[in-house]
Amino acid sequence: SEKITVFQKGNFQVTEXSSHFV
């Protein structure tokens, strides 16, 4: 899966499996 960076609630959430960066 490609890493999708989503700007949500002032935090950067990267959807990769179940990995997320805050």
Swiss-Prot record:
Keywords: Chlorophyll catabolism, Hydrolase. The keyword Cytoplasm does not apply. Pathway: Porphyrin-containing compound metabolism; chlorophyll degradation. GO terms for biological process: chlorophyll catabolic process. The keyword DNA-binding does not apply. Transmembrane segments: none annotated. One of its GO terms (molecular function) is chlorophyllase activity. It comes from the Eukaryota. Optimum pH is 6.6-8.6 for chlorophyll a hydrolysis, and 6.6-7.6 for chlorophyll b hydrolysis. Its EC number is 3.1.1.14. It catalyses: a chlorophyll + H2O = a chlorophyllide + phytol + H(+). Catalyzes the hydrolysis of ester bond in chlorophyll to yield chlorophyllide and phytol. Belongs to the AB hydrolase superfamily. Lipase family. This is Chlorophyllase type 1. It comes from Chenopodium album (Fat hen).
